Amino acid sequence: MHCVQYQAGRCHSCQWLSIPYSRQLEDKQRHLSALLSGHSVAQWLSAQPSAELAMRNKAKMVVSGSVERPLLGMLQRDGSGVDLCDCPLYPDSFAVVFAALKSFIPRAGLTPYSVARRRGELKYLLLTESRLNGEMMLRFVLRSETKLAQLRQALPWLQAQLPQLAVISVNIQPVHMAILEGEREIFLTSQQVLSESFNGVPLYIRPQSFFQTNPAVAQALYAQARDWVQALGVTEMWDLFCGVGGFGLHCATPEMTLTGIEISAGAIACARRSAAQLGLTKVSFAALDSGAFADAHSAVPQLVLVNPPRRGIGAALCDYMNRMAPPYILYSSCNAQSMVQDIERLADYRIEKVRLFDMFPHTAHYEVLTLLVRASA
């Protein structure tokens, strides 16, 4: 993949861009194998590759420059802005949106936020696209509501230019820190979710709810989880850290009792909507802390699926799972190091299957799916 910004030394987000893609995949597989070298793995599956460019469905653009000439991209260490509208990770459909936004920002008088001076209003633009129908969600991250009325007044022009913007919102992030978003979301459109579909499973994307940024690889990841779970023939499972329900809804059958737990109420609303659309009557989702939920329930499901943040599930939840002793644990991780730490805590489980998914090409990061089986199962 050729990138002008990388070649010019202005952006190094894709640290491995100079490495041929086939070798990137080999290096990631070697890294994962080394991390698990102290464990017996019954079956290694071949790594799931990614497209090398235009694979992302989301852009997180720092807004810098001036209101007359905004830059959309990132900040360098010296505080100067780098425009990344030509980033080859984004699909072609993003280019027209970025161009229109550069005209809209001065129309609406949205002064870019200056980190050095702690002045200005517009901090980020967050763009997400649905592969299902091409609809997009655009979020303006503002320091305050000072420019909200101006934004509303100018918005019809933007909507006329970009009818694909089905969901538009403002997020208020008042803190002078490198925090992407605040708690308050103000919708500027009647539609508040994007519709998506992976492997025939309807999914919904809301502001502030996690959704994978590489949809083709995410689709393969969910399909692999479904195939492994269905081969086990389980009829009761928990989906902890479930997000919008991608894993659980892929694994669920009409006969299965599935409980999905996620801290985000918005994500749970999306998961419930998907379950209703699929006609799954034995599926329930609740907005709770996953660890607290597990600790409060004495019933033991046949399988627990976990998809935690980078820190992993941690010692407390591992200890609980050892005591609860479900026959199977399906662990999806975006940080193999924390996953291996958790596996070492799950002393009563052996590793049955492992597969790497290259969710983040041109970087050292990857996703991994691991099936753990209780030694006595």
Swiss-Prot record:
* Pfam families documented for this protein: tRNA_U5-meth_tr (PF05958)
Binding residues annotated for S-adenosyl-L-methionine, in chain numbering: Q212, F241, E262, N307
Q: Which GO terms describe its biological process?
A: rRNA base methylation
Cystine pairings recorded for this chain? none
- List of residues binding [4Fe-4S] cluster: C3, C11, C14, C87
UniProt catalytic activity? uridine(747) in 23S rRNA + S-adenosyl-L-methionine = 5-methyluridine(747) in 23S rRNA + S-adenosyl-L-homocysteine + H(+)
Its top-level enzyme class, in one word, is transferase
Q: Which domain of life is it from?
A: Bacteria
> Do the record's keywords include Iron?
yes
Task: List the active-site residues.
Answer: C334 (nucleophile)
**Documented EC number(s):** 2.1.1.189
CDD domains membership: AdoMet_MTases
PROSITE patterns reported in the protein's UniProt record = SAM_MT_RNA_M5U, TRMA_1, TRMA_2
Q: Which GO terms describe its molecular function?
A: 4 iron, 4 sulfur cluster binding; iron ion binding; rRNA (uridine-C5-)-methyltransferase activity
Q: Which UniProt keywords apply?
A: 4Fe-4S, Iron, Iron-sulfur, Metal-binding, Methyltransferase, rRNA processing, S-adenosyl-L-methionine, Transferase
Q: What does this protein do?
A: Catalyzes the formation of 5-methyl-uridine at position 747 (m5U747) in 23S rRNA.
Q: What family name appears in the similarity comment?
A: Belongs to the class I-like SAM-binding methyltransferase superfamily. RNA M5U methyltransferase family. RlmC subfamily.
Task: Name the PANTHER family on file.
Answer: RNA M5U METHYLTRANSFERASE, TRNA (URACIL(54)-C(5))-METHYLTRANSFERASE
Q: What is this protein called in UniProt?
A: 23S rRNA (uracil(747)-C(5))-methyltransferase RlmC
Q: Which organism is it from?
A: Edwardsiella ictaluri (strain 93-146)
